[in-house]
Amino acid sequence: MNGPPDDRSEATADGDRAVVVAVIASTFFVGFGGGVVFPILPNLGAVLGISPFLVGLILSANRFTRLVANAPAGTLVDRAGTRTPFVVGLTVQGVATAGYIVAVNSGAPATWFLLARVAWGIGSAMVFATAYTIAADVSDGGTRGTNMGLIRGGVIFGFPTGLVVGGIVSEFYGTVAAFVVATVFALFASLLAYLLVPETHVEGDPRESVRPWDVDTSLPALTVGTVNFTVGFAYIGVVFATLVLFLKTNDISVLGLDAQGSSGVFMAVTVVSAAVFMFLGGYVSDQSGRRMPTLLTFLVVTFVGLSLFAVASSVPVLSLACVLVGAGQGGTSGPLMALLADLTPDERMGRAMGTNNVFGDVGGGLGPMVSLPLVDSVGFLPVYAACAVLPLAAGGLLVVGIYRETGELSPRVERPRGGTEDLSD
C-alpha cells in the first residue's frame, strides 16, 4: 500500500515543480517588457512634450485598466481554467510592448503610449490571476509560500532586466532599440507558455457571464488586498515613478550614467533584492508553519528602507535604501499571497487572486498620479517620509483582520504531514 502511493506522490511533486518552473520562465520574459518603460518614459516625457501628470497617467494606465480587468480575469480562471487565459494574456502583453515602438515614431506619442499601457493591463490581469492560481493549485501548506514567491519572482527578475536594458540600451542604442528587444522577449514568453504550461484548475461552466464586479469580498481577501495596496502605492507608485527625477534633482549617478541610466541600475538593485527575498520570505513562512511573523518583520524592513529614501543624498545610502525597500516588498509578497490562498477555498481562488490584484493596482496606479505632481510642488522628503508610514499601518491592519478571521494573532499553516492546523477551518 505504501509503495505505489509514494511513487505517485513523487511523480506528482515532480510534475508540480515542472509547472512552477514553466510559469516562472514565462513570467520572467514578459516581466522584461514591463521593466523597459519605467526608466525611459519619465525622462522621455520631457523630450516628447508630455506633461508630468500625463506621464504619470501613462505609467498608471495598465494598473487602472486592471482595476476593471482583474476581477473578470479571476472569475474566468475559476470557470474556464488557467492555461488559455495565461497564454492569451502573455500574447496581449507582447503585442502591447510593440505599441511602444509605434508611440516613439508617432505624431501622437502620448495616445499610443496610453493605448499600449491599457492593452498591457488587460494582458497582465489575465497573467497574474492565472499565475498565482496555478501556484495555489500545485501547492499545499508546506510549499505554498515558496511557490508563490518563486512565481512572483519570475516577474521580478524579468523586471530588473528590463530596467537595466531600458536605461542602458536606450542611452547607447536609442529608445526604439530597447523597445524592440522588449517586444521580442514578451512574445517569446507567450510561445514558452503555449508549449510548456498545462491546465491546472478545475473548470467551471464557461457559459456563465463574467462580470467586473464579481469579486471576493471575504475578510481575508479585503485584508490582504489592503496590505497589497499600501505596499504597491509606496513601492511601485511612488519610489519607481519618481526615482529618475530624484536622481536628477540631487545629482546622483552611478557608472558614469545619466539620471535615466542610473535609475535603471538603482531600480534593478531594488527589484533583485525583492526577488531574492520573495523566495526567502515564502520559504521561511512555509518552514515555520506561520505567515504572520515573516510578514510583520518585512513590513518593518520596508518602513526602514523608505525612511532611508527620504534622507538619502549619496550613492551608498540610496543603495542601502533600495536593498531594504526591495527586501521588504519581496519578503512580504510570497507569504502574503500564500496567506490569502491558505484562507480561500479552491473554488474561489481565482476571484480571490483577482481581487487582491485590484487592490495592488489601485495602489500602484494611484501612486504616480499623486507622487509626480507632489514632488514637483513640495519636494521629495515629505512624500517619501509619508510613504514610510504606510507599511506600519498595513501591519496593524493585517493583525486585526487575521485575528478577526481566525481568532489567533499568528495562526498556523496546514502542512501535509506535519499535523498543524488548517487556516481555513
Predicted regions and their residues:
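C-terminal ends and interior cores of transmembrane alpha-helices
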Residues: 91-107, 300-313
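Cytoplasmic helix-loop-helix junction between adjacent transmembrane helices
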Residues: 114-157
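Juxtamembrane intracellular "pre-TM" segments in multi-pass secondary transporters
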Residues: 2-16, 198-226, 414-425
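Helix-loop-helix hairpin linking two adjacent transmembrane segments in secondary transporters
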Residues: 151-197, 381
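Helix-to-loop junctions at the C-terminal end of transmembrane segments
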Residues: 69-81, 277-290
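Hydrophobic core of transmembrane alpha-helices in multi-pass small-molecule transporters
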Residues: 28, 110-126, 317-331
